């Protein structure tokens, strides 16, 4: 019998600073609307979501400031690297996110850009609140202490 070609989730870009700079309340998986050359560039692993954020415009959620560089093999039909990209969500999810942004002063921060099992580009969005400087220091102290604790336990045997 022929074996099935199992596709794993392939993470293309990750926003590692987001968990440090924001207190994450909730996460949502959103589809992302890309052109052909953008998909090829993302499959090559050349996307950056570190400085990006999501915002609502006209009842839709858009990914702003994400960088997907131009696809080198494309000619004149290439895309603009920093254009706003529409995120694909259900209306109920959009209303929930927009309400949290407007009422509670929260932010939509992208955490991961990846391809799911079906080969579709997905974005993991976090509904987050910005941390103050003392909160960031506290997080760093906890992380350092957990590392030190692990070292001490390993040293004792």
From Swiss-Prot:
One of its GO terms (cellular component) is cytosol. One of its GO terms (molecular function) is RNA binding. The keyword RNA-binding applies. GO terms for biological process: trans-translation. Gene3D superfamilies: 2.40.280.10. Residues 136-157 are annotated as: Disordered. Keywords: Cytoplasm, RNA-binding. Residues 136-151 have a biased composition (Basic and acidic residues). The keyword Protein biosynthesis does not apply. It is found in: Cytoplasm. Pfam families: SmpB. Belongs to the SmpB family. Required for rescue of stalled ribosomes mediated by trans-translation. Binds to transfer-messenger RNA (tmRNA), required for stable association of tmRNA with ribosomes. tmRNA and SmpB together mimic tRNA shape, replacing the anticodon stem-loop with SmpB. tmRNA is encoded by the ssrA gene; the 2 termini fold to resemble tRNA(Ala) and it encodes a 'tag peptide', a short internal open reading frame. During trans-translation Ala-aminoacylated tmRNA acts like a tRNA, entering the A-site of stalled ribosomes, displacing the stalled mRNA. This is SsrA-binding protein. It comes from Rhodopseudomonas palustris (strain HaA2).
């Amino acid at each position: 019998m022929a074996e099935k070609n199992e596709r794993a989730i392939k993470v293309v870009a990750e926003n590692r600073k987001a968990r440090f700079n924001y207190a994450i309340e909730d996460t949502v998986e959103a589809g992302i609307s890309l052109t052909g050359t953008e998909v090829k560039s993302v499959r090559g692993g050349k996307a950056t979501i570190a400085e990006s954020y999501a915002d609502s415009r006209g009842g839709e959620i858009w990914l702003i400031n994400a960088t997907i560089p131009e696809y080198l093999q494309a000619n004149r039909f290439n895309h603009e690297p920093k254009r706003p990209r529409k995120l694909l969500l259900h209306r109920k999810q959009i209303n929930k996110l927009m309400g949290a942004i407007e009422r509670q002063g929260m932010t939509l921060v992208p955490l991961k850009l990846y391809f799911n099992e079906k080969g579709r580009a997905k974005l993991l969005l976090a509904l987050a609140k910005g941390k103050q400087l003392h909160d960031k220091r506290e997080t760093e102290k906890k992380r350092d202490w957990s590392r030190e604790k692990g070292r001490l336990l390993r040293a004792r045997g």
